[in-house]
Amino acid sequence: MLEYQNIFTRVQVHGPADMGVPMKHTNFGREGTPVFNRWMGKIGDAQIGPIYLGFLGIASLAFGFMAIEIIGLNMLASVNWSPLEFMRRFFWLTLDPPTAEYGLTLAPLKKGGWWQIAGFCLTASILLWWIRTYRRARALGMGTHVTYAFGAAIWLYLVLGFFRPLAMGNFSEAVPFGIFSHLEWTNNFSVNYGNLFYNPFHMISIAFLYGSALLFAMHAATILAVSRYGGEREIEQIVDRGTASERAALFWRWTMGFNATMESIHRWAWWFAVLCPIAGGIGILLTGTAVDNWYEWGIKHGLTNGNPYDMTVPSTLP
């Protein structure tokens, strides 16, 4: 007897290409001839295309391309236009925001101006794509849950690169474009403002981050575990609970004492995921504007007694 395992997609059934629901009045059509890719089918739908971009999609990609082009060319210029050095030092290359002396004004190109232009293009690209998700959802008769979830991530992005620098009075507070440079910015941000771990909104954000990962793993594992009973057909299980849903519910009642429903688990996951960047954005926005030192704030409000841990290693160990 074959063992039933479905951690990876092992069976792929290819029917006729799905061209999507009929489109109403539009100046743009779906582009591309559908093709099937076996390796894409390992993780998702094997069909690639056709795709609909429309005006908003094309404009978003254009602004995104300009942002990446500006960032990339500035990084390439910083290594004297050497492709080999660009690849070797790629993780260390950066495009920094203007220094504090320029405040909120437009800085010279080589002193932060390129960062401002790239930031504008990237923000325009993201916002245009966000509007596109709303319009595509409406056109397909869907709810706008994805749009609002995407908006939560955009909120955090705008806090880091625009809202907080605006409140602080200069763009030097913003995050640079670069892999290691933005990690260094994160470390310095926490150090300069007294350890971000004492920020209650950071605590809430991390709780929702870990909670999202836990819920995602629990839900995915549960559905895979009952897919032999048709558990992956969740819409059917929501409106007409079958043996897959009953077995999953019984498992969690036995192991946790409580079970979500086939519908409510998605609400749990949506709220946990959305509240992570929302809480994080609030915490970042309060840092430096309302609270200058989170460690001292934590002492004042009883989060810590202010006594540092003794990390001294004794000269003689027992």
Regions found by a protein language model. Name each.
Residues 1-59, 75, 79-100, 249-253, ...:
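N-terminal juxtamembrane cytosolic/stromal segments of multi-pass membrane proteins
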Residues 31-44, 77-87, 95-100, 122-148, ...:
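Cytoplasmic membrane-interface regions of multi-pass membrane proteins
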Residues 69-77, 131-144, 162-175, 213-234, ...:
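Juxtamembrane/interface segments at transmembrane-helix termini
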Residues 75-106, 165-196, 235-252, 293-318:
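Membrane-interfacial helical/loop segments at transmembrane boundaries in membrane proteins
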Residues 108-117, 121-163, 176:
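Alpha-helical transmembrane segments with an aromatic anchor "belt"
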Residues 111-112, 116, 198-216:
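Alpha-helical transmembrane segments
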Residues 263-291:
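Final/C-terminal transmembrane alpha-helix of multipass membrane proteins
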